[in-house]
A protein has these predicted regions:
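A short acidic, Gly/Pro-enriched loop at the edge of an enzyme's catalytic core
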Residues: 132-141
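Class I SAM-dependent methyltransferase SAM/SAH-binding core
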Residues: 70-74, 78-131
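Conserved class I S-adenosyl-L-methionine
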Residues: 16-69, 80-88, 103-107, 111, 172-201
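A short SAM/SAH-binding and catalytic strip from SAM-dependent methyltransferases
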Residues: 140-154, 177
């Protein structure tokens, strides 16, 4: 049986555990601040955690992990995939956590120490396109979740995944397809009479975003298949889940969308509103959307992709 510490970390997402042991007043980089303290605040934190655990399980199932294998988690973040993988490769296995955030790697190391599993983990600080601290043909599986959307050169990342895999090694990943929502209205609501104000808010939102965020919108599921095929992966499979839903939402849902960025590289909608509109205009803009939310239902669009495959023996 795996050590009790692994079971404790494999059941909930790591973030629910790290929030309790990470110093809240520590100066953190934007990635760790968002993953450990911002993302799960508000009324939908528990729902988000449950959603991420479902993703984790699907990614790990499709990686086909076995006891004794070595696994690389690229963009390991708060350790959601890594600690789940550790449970599956016990005994004798090893999980390598790779992230660009030293703060997140330190948080995961602290949790591993608390759980008594630090000997089964290693940490490296590399970009997904340059895994230079991971030797050629050294791991049995590469896993990743919501990482490639931040990477401009996705083909280079796929080539690095291929390089570090042993013959017969596997890849398994999850990515949101953000381009699927480009044609939808903000909040899923037609701006109607506040369309001129909404246009200014959208312009301000785009101006506040770093240039790198374009990487989130310039690919779809076909691009994922292409770059991994070109990198030398075989037996590739991809599952696309797309939905358009019209549901009644609460004002708490609307406030969460206003105040919490969906990733650490973009501003909040409230910041964009403040940058674009006068206080009176902002009040008019928000009052319109609040009435629309209260009247419901609201249309939401989402698309996500799971990709998995292997390299030749």
């Amino acid at each position: 049986m795996p050590p009790r510490g692994i079971l404790k970390l494999a059941l909930p997402t790591l973030c629910a555990y790290t929030i309790g042991i990470t110093a809240l007043h520590q100066e953190l980089d934007c990635w760790s601040r968002w993953q450990l303290h911002t993302r799960f605040r508000g009324p939908y934190g528990k729902e988000t955690l449950e959603f991420l655990c479902t993703i984790r399980d699907k990614v790990l199932d499709r990686a086909g992990l076995q006891p004794g294998e070595w696994v690389l988690d690229v963009g390991s973040g708060d350790g959601l995939l890594a600690f789940g993988a550790l449970h599956r490769v016990f005994p004798g296995g090893l999980v390598i956590l790779d992230d660009i955030s030293q703060d997140l790697l330190d948080a995961c190391t602290e949790v591993a120490h608390e759980a008594g599993v630090e000997e089964q983990l290693r940490c490296v600080r590399n970009d997904a396109t340059d895994l230079s601290d991971v030797p050629d043909h050294s791991v049995d599986a590469v896993i990743t979740r919501s990482v490639l959307l931040y990477v401009e050169d996705k083909a280079k990342a796929a080539a690095e995944f291929r390089r570090v895999l042993r013959p017969g090694g596997r890849v398994s990943l999850f990515e949101p397809i953000s381009s699927a929502a480009i044609n939808g209205h903000r909040f899923g609501i037609d701006p109607g009479p506040v369309a001129p104000l909404a246009a200014r808010v959208e312009e301000a939102f785009r101006a506040l975003q770093p240039a790198q965020t374009q990487a989130m919108l310039n690919f779809d599921e076909r691009d994922l298949l292409r770059v991994f095929e070109e990198a030398g992966f075989t037996h590739l499979e991809l599952e696309l889940r797309a939905s358009v839903k019209r549901e009644h939402q609460s004002l708490a849902w609307f406030d969460a969308l206003l105040n919490a960025p969906t990733n650490p590289r973009i501003p909040t909608m409230r910041q964009a509103i403040s940058a674009a509109l006068t206080p009176d205009e902002a009040a008019t803009y928000l009052a319109y959307y609040r009435r629309a939310v209260a009247g419901g239902p609201i249309a939401t669009r989402q698309a996500v992709a799971y990709l998995w495959g292997s390299v030749g023996e």
